Curated annotation (Swiss-Prot):
Cofactor: Mn(2+); Co(2+)
Stretch forming the signal peptide: 1-30
Function recorded in the entry: Metalloprotease.
GO cellular component: membrane
Native organism: Amphimedon queenslandica
Biased composition (Low complexity): 435-471
Stated name of the protein: Metalloprotease TIKI homolog
Enzyme Commission code(s) on record: 3.4.-.-
Bilayer disposition of the protein: Single-pass type I membrane protein
Family, similarity comment: Belongs to the TIKI family.
Residues exposed to the Extracellular side: 31-489
Keywords: Glycoprotein, Hydrolase, Membrane, Metal-binding, Metalloprotease, Protease, Signal, Transmembrane, Transmembrane helix
Length: 510
């Protein structure tokens, strides 16, 4: 009997490692603490009115990266406010559907027919190389077997979705979002979505400041020829890194938490491209094309939206009200030229930026604030899919993003891999549509899944918006919405099967 136990012991160790790896592997989160907290500024402003209106500058990143470092006075304002106003209600099915549809080419058009041939081949090759990295990004140093490869491929295809139908600018943003960190953090809600859900769970009224067109359409107006230049330069930068652990930087998170976000935002281009000094072989003509793109987007995505947001806030200030409002919008709208705070002050309003040390009396946040903002956090122990992604036939986990200037690349990441969606998948066909390159160009194959997604009929009232002339805005046709979700039944089943085999081996040994 001792011999049998010795023989089965390595199997037991292997199975226990599998369970521990699948349920205990932590997700990548960040927490940054500044050395001089006494003088640290929060991204919280107060408009002196009765009652006051508060403005909070967010970052569109997974909430776990920031929530612990959000100052107490911001959390107090969230607790005492009766209303939370966000850029867009990403939890609203119509908003999500329209944002997704906005990203796609007109009917009967594909990237294969739009992109220059050589550029299309480069995109195909790059996707194949990134697909080969997914098992390493998901499982780390764990051995890569057939099951992990299959699951990695399923997640990859779910994240790139119907990529051949994307407009070129959205293809560029998809490519920039495919990094190890984004894959590992795909199921963590963005801070904006977390605040939205938490406020709604606390019984507060959550309203939208904008509609999807104001955020999406400026990108679709870009000249495709110049977008092709940006896409080529992005691939020039990423291709040498494609066989390694491509990661996004957290330096802006540290800068944000330490109260000096202004310099970073003012110098960063809107498109998710590295700085010009990092782009190889950049000609003066290419640099001019990239600069003209950035100038156009700054005027449309930053300045025009700043004007609209400030008008919305001023309209609210002119009303007779007795309730407190908190506006949680991207921090980039509060810094730089012609920002929201500057426009409010120009109209005579008193707006003060608050220090983290300034106390704001208010009731404490509920103890279950995390589960209100992130319902999936209650399943952490059994969240095997944090390392083994699945695509069950219900409950997809992605919604399209909001587009704010200071973190535009991260916002686009949420379209493909971050927040949980409220869509219901009636049917999912993972029938690969294979695009093969002939031997004259490359021996590369990329499979793209197709999916049928239907938004549910909501029992709640229609999402309220603070914007003006909503009746003049129409919805675009819906389009394919890629999704990849984690299923609780799958998680429990895998753990049960593993434990069953452990007991079976022990029993046979005895």
């Amino acid at each position: 009997m001792q011999v049998k136990i010795v023989q089965v012991f390595p199997c037991l160790v292997l199975l226990v490692k599998l369970v521990l790896l699948s349920v205990l592997l932590p997700s990548a989160t960040g927490s940054y603490h500044c050395s001089n907290n006494a003088t640290q500024n929060s991204y919280l402003w107060r408009i002196e009115a009765s009652p006051p209106i508060y403005l909070f500058g967010t970052m569109h990143v997974p909430y776990k990266k920031l929530w612990d470092d959000v100052p107490d006075n911001v959390k107090s304002v969230l607790s005492l406010s009766e209303h939370l106003c966000v850029e867009l209600r990403l939890t609203d099915s119509e908003t999500s559907k329209n944002l997704s549809a906005c990203r796609y080419l007109p009917k009967n058009e594909t990237l294969e027919s739009v992109l220059p041939g050589g550029l299309y081949v480069r995109v195909l090759k790059y996707f194949v190389r990134i697909q080969n990295q997914f098992p390493k990004w998901l499982f780390g140093n764990a051995s890569i077997n057939g099951l992990s490869r299959i699951e990695s491929d399923r997640l990859f295809h779910a994240m790139i979705g119907n990529w051949n139908r994307l407009r070129p600018v959205w293809l560029l943003m998809l490519i920039s979002s495919l990094s190890r960190e984004n894959v590992q953090e795909r199921s963590i809600p963005l801070l904006d979505v977390f605040l939205d859900r938490a406020a709604e769970g606390m019984g507060k009224n959550v309203e939208a400041v904008e509609v999807y067109k104001e955020q999406c359409r400026p990108f679709n107006r870009l000249n495709n020829t110049k977008v092709f230049v940006a896409l080529r330069k992005l691939l020039d930068y990423l291709e040498p890194l494609a066989d390694g652990p491509i990661s996004s930087t957290d330096s802006d998170l540290e800068t944000y938490n330490c109260g000096d976000f202004k310099s970073l935002v003012s110098a960063r281009p809107i498109l998710p491209l590295p700085s010009s000094s990092k782009l190889p072989n950049l000609t003066s003509e290419e640099a001019g094309d990239l600069e003209s793109i950035n100038e156009f987007l700054v005027s449309q995505i930053v300045y025009r939206r700043n004007r609209r947001m400030s008008k919305t806030i001023m309209s609210l200030l002119s009303r007779q009200r007795n309730e407190t409002y908190l506006f949680a919008i991207g921090a980039g709208h509060f810094v730089g030229e012609r920002n929201v705070v500057h426009m409010l002050k120009k109209k005579g309003y008193s707006v003060n930026r608050l220090s983290v040390t300034e106390t704001i009396p208010g009731p404490p946040l509920p103890k279950n604030i995390i589960s209100l903002g992130d319902p999936s956090s209650q399943l952490t122990i059994l969240n095997i899919s944090s390392t083994i992604p699945t695509l069950p036939p219900n409950r997809p986990s992605h919604v399209p993003p909001t587009l704010s200037p200071e973190t535009i690349a991260r916002i686009i990441q949420s379209v493909f891999n971050n927040t949980q969606s409220i869509y219901t998948v009636d049917s999912v066909e993972v029938t690969p549509t294979t695009t093969s390159l002939n031997s004259a160009t490359a021996s590369t194959t990329v499979a793209t899944p197709t999916s049928s997604v239907t938004p549910p009929t909501s029992s709640s009232s229609q999402t309220r918006s603070l914007t003006i002339s909503d009746s003049q805005r129409t919805s675009d046709d819906s389009a394919f919405i890629p999704s990849a979700s984690s299923g609780l039944r799958y998680n429990i089943g895998l753990v049960c099967v593993t434990l069953f085999f452990v007991l079976l081996i022990i029993t046979s040994a005895l």
